[in-house]
């Protein structure tokens, strides 16, 4: 806080990763517009990895066997299915018409995976939908307990940390991003780069910079009803894969680097 005030007072150039973050600094710390503050959005890199080692023979892990195996995992803290098994299950589910949601990020109160679980509890609406939560548990197992309590082992998968996300995005229909607060929302961009649309809250810092109607539906408020309605719309919508990829490419690591270099040159001129 003190640094931000001093930087504005002395016209010291700083950069932030989203327009929403800039607006919050101006409103909460400075009380006015900051001419020294430049927005340079985050970037990421798409890796075109080979998935050969994840492909297994048809029928080696049936749907029933995976669900039984996953139920056993749920009842033990910090235990997850093998990535290769989850890959096979998602591949099978996709082939059989399931709609698949991803929610990427460590499982915390702020990331708000709990709300996604509460929404998937409505199995009448989301009977044909599978949600995968990717990330380490940093919530003392609260989300895990809720999945067990609601008997959602057929609808919500705790996937754990996934260092091969690039080969999994092809299974995803919609990327959920329901954080309470978030500076930029890198998982949104990662999804875009693979042609995956996003459902997120209208009031997040990330939304202002990452909203494109071709790639995102915004939830107007934070109620379960609003998220459910928006998610249903997203799952029924005919998204254009290539258009979303083009939007994702606007946030590549190369473009981010170029913006920083140009900003630095401008500051030093």
Identify the function of each model-found stretch.
Residues 4-37, 44-77:
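A short, active-site helix/loop in glycosyltransferases that binds the activated sugar's phosphate group
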Residues 238-268:
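A charged, aromatic-enriched C-terminal amphipathic alpha-helix characteristic of glycosyltransferases
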Residues 180:
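Aromatic "clamp/platform" in nucleotide-sugar-dependent glycosyltransferases that forms part
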Residues 15, 58-111, 117-120:
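Conserved donor-binding/catalytic core segment of Leloir-type glycosyltransferases
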Residues 161-162, 168-172, 260:
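Short alpha-helical donor nucleotide-sugar binding micro-motif in glycosyltransferases
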Residues 143-162:
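Nucleotide-activated donor-binding/catalytic signature segment of Leloir-type glycosyltransferases, i.e.
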